[in-house]
Regions:
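Alpha-helical transmembrane segments of multi-pass membrane proteins
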Residues: 95-109, 133-154, 174, 178-179, ...
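Early transmembrane hairpin of solute transport permeases
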Residues: 57-168, 362
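Membrane-interface helix termini and inter-helical loops of multi-pass transporters
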Residues: 39-52, 167-178, 268-275, 328-341
Length: 446
């Protein structure tokens, strides 16, 4: 039955959902019109808000582009190819492939969201190479489903923010340690339930072999070849210039790689196991340099990798423009206040979760959402005598929840997989529906 429902949503999404870039453009027009209708802003002001915010995510766009590029480079190195290949051997059937990829991606996203996005996609490619009969689209949707857990894990921006001295709501709610957020009973229940149930759900979404979505064989061969190509040891090249000798020098890679390792060690000594997107990119980059052996091999791999970052580079400014309109026009505040006004001490965390899920379509950034909703939800929680830590985590889970049907965060996986958003979103709708249940139970009854 589940596979039949998933098949229905898959057909609908593949027929009517536009490409991720067009989705961003459509959202732009929707927010533009809503801002004129529901606020006192004129069309000229909405244009100003849009243009003013358009370049506000440049740093983040570069970070996400690099996580695709550096992750690809690292995965194309001999050591990582062998490691992912060994893990992929745990799956011998399509069902095992779905279970393995979902579980590994979920664990990786709990550790760090950027790490999890890349590792899940790359493992899925290895598994698809080993089990060619698996539905490649469902496999990539399974890899993306692990991202649902990220805001309840160690890189969650909201719990880490409110645990940091000097955060913008410190005078209102104080400093909230992660023992009251990440390691609370409700968060452990939600994470544990999803960690167990998501692999099983994705396994149930498998369809009969005759109905498996067909993927262009050239696509899978192309993506797999980047990662699984035969390892060929280059013979000592007869180089005629000093520049060519430097390009093929292992010494250069070792020296710069050791410098990178020194900083990585320093970072963890100073900050503990604090992973953020910058240090993840740094680790991927310098291990990629070391594992490829020579600068020339590294650059050859980088040339292949950058081809996958184009969609991310183009789309992020449009989402920044959408965020600019939502925030500057007051639309985001209106949405949050509407949910606050219909809340009581029992329903506030749950309605905070719902409102965050809706807002996430237009402001797909956990930190950005907290900057908008924190100032509204936390005073409301204090006024209703509701746990502020739980209210904050409700916003965090709302952000994570609708990521399943918001193409923004799927871009890195889609770039690596060589797929379009419509290829996985039909399955992700089912994941969205199911995950609503354990998240709601955790926020209402724990």
């Amino acid at each position: 039955m589940l596979s039949s429902i998933a098949n229905f949503f898959d057909r609908m999404v593949r027929r009517y959902l536009p490409d991720a870039f067009l989705f961003a453009i459509i959202l732009t027009f929707i927010v533009f019109i809503l801002g004129i209708v529901f606020t006192d802003n004129s069309p000229v002001q909405m244009v100003e808000f849009w243009g003013g915010g358009f370049w506000n995510l440049l740093e983040f766009a570069m970070q996400m582009s690099l996580i695709v590029v550096t992750g690809y480079i690292l995965a194309n190195s001999p050591i990582v190819k062998r490691l992912l290949g060994k893990i992929s051997k745990l799956a011998n059937t399509p069902g095992q492939a779905i279970l393995l990829v979902t579980f590994v991606a979920s664990i990786a996203c709990l550790i760090n969201y950027g790490f999890g996005l890349v590792v899940g996609a790359l493992l899925a490619i290895h598994v698809a190479k080993r089990v060619p009969s698996v539905d490649y689209r469902l496999l990539m949707a399974s890899a993306y489903s692990g991202f649902l857990l990220w805001h309840g894990g160690f890189s969650g921006s909201i719990p880490l923010t409110i645990a940091t001295q000097g955060h913008f709501l410190e005078e209102t709610m104080g400093i909230i340690p992660v023992t009251e957020t990440l390691f609370s009973s409700y968060n452990l229940f939600i994470v544990g339930t999803l960690l167990i149930s998501l692999p099983l759900l994705n396994r149930l979404l498998m369809r009969p072999t005759r109905n498996v979505g067909e993927i262009d064989p050239e696509l899978l061969n192309l993506q797999a070849s980047v990662i699984e190509e035969e390892e060929v040891e280059e013979a000592e090249e007869k180089t005629s210039t000093p520049a060519e000798r430097l390009e093929n020098s292992r010494v250069i890679s070792i020296l710069i790689g050791l410098l990178g390792l020194a900083f990585i060690l320093y970072h963890f000594v100073q900050n503990g196991l604090n992973l953020n997107i910058n240090i993840v990119n740094f680790i991927f980059l310098f291990f990629g340099i070391l594992f490829h052996g020579t600068p020339r091999r590294f650059l050859n791999s980088a040339t292949d990798a950058v081809k996958n970052a184009g969609g991310i580079i183009v789309q992020f400014p449009f989402y920044a423009g959408i965020m600019g309109m939502m925030i500057s026009s007051g639309l985001s505040d209106q949405l949050s206040m509407w949910f606050v006004n219909i809340s009581n001490d029992f329903t506030l965390p749950w309605l905070s979760f719902i409102s965050a899920g809706i807002l996430n379509f237009f402001v797909p950034s956990g930190g950005g959402q907290w900057a908008i909703q924190g100032d509204i939800m936390i005073p409301a929680a204090i006024g209703l005598d509701v746990d502020t830590a739980k209210t904050a985590m409700a916003v965090a889970w709302g952000d994570a929840w609708t990521n399943m049907v918001q193409p923004f965060w799927a871009l890195p996986i889609l770039a690596i997989a060589g797929l379009k958003v419509r290829d996985i979103m039909g399955f992700c709708v089912m994941i969205l529906f199911w995950s609503f249940i354990p998240i709601s139970i955790g926020l209402l009854f724990f």
